[in-house]
């Protein structure tokens, strides 16, 4: 064997710095001699010239090339409430509650309408869809219809085998019809061609929560202080990468 070298990608001489424009509007309001402070804030952020891998012709010998092709926007609202519950000479107890709501959107991909990306944990299946007009964080995959039932099969009592009935869709590119068994995952044949393949994949979830926040309590006694913090998030789906990798059927 002889060592060799090859290019890992196509360089681009036209790359630019990513840029951001942000607008923040907020106000601080104090009550009861500043023992309660309420701080609402609205923000709008627009990012352009985002660096993304763009598809290139296969004749180049590569699949993608890094380019400035993306534009995104973020719009949201933050609310913070701080209260001084106890304030003595040697002891203070302060509480802070905050909640946030954010919505992001892909504004442009410079000619492209969408990209399909892998989760990058050693699994070659596309798991994310980056699409113009949609939020970042869309999960992409197959919709399930539950599990294959005994009624979906012809049973041969002589050799005690199950054979999937004709006309019932299955992943023909991954399994033979004789490999399918009751209890295996059954996926939605979205285009009705009786075959489960990449054309049946669709957006199945979104990682973005509806809102999220936290609650912090801080206690100070002379030269000592102690605090504890809780966080919460409501809405948004989670991609179970371990289950995705280890569950093939």
Give short role names for the model-derived ranges.
Residues 1-134:
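Extracellular/periplasmic, surface-exposed regions of secreted and cell-surface proteins
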Residues 2, 19, 47, 54-56, ...:
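Solvent-exposed, flexible loop/coil residues
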Residues 9, 62-64, 198-201, 210:
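Glycine- and acidic
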Residues 41-44, 200, 228-234:
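Active-site proximal loops enriched in glycine and acidic residues that flank catalytic Cys/His/Asp
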Residues 67, 86-205, 247-248:
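Conserved small-residue
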Residues 179-182, 233-249:
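Extracytoplasmic gating/loop element in the C-terminal half of outer-membrane beta-barrel translocons
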Residues 206-236:
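C-terminal substrate/ligand-recognition segments
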